[in-house]
Amino acid sequence: MYFGCIKKIPDILYLNQKGNRSQNINKNYTYTIKGKKVKYILDSAIIRSQNQNHYSCYITGNKKEYAFDGASFSYLLPFKWKDKINSNDTWKFEDTFQEVFDFKLCDVTYFYYRNEKKN
């Protein structure tokens, strides 16, 4: 990743992944930016279903992992999603049976937050 033209170290990074990937996604990344080591930690993700008709999101709150699917009648569901990002697991939500999700086959945007204090 290139950070040469930035004026300020970013607080958030995002990583877009197109479906059908073979390489692993890291839960943490460390970069040297402006001479300083900066660590980013995976916080959330948005995933598009295999048939590309629906999105769902995955968040971390108080160190717990959750899923949210707008078409479901539930709000935040406890869901251990970080363990699935490099697996071939597929899943469906209760109210959207036709939508199948998979971190390796679907389009995903991952969001990372900066773990160091600001300058």
Residue ranges of each PLM-predicted region?
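Core regions of eukaryotic protease modules
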Residues: M1-K37
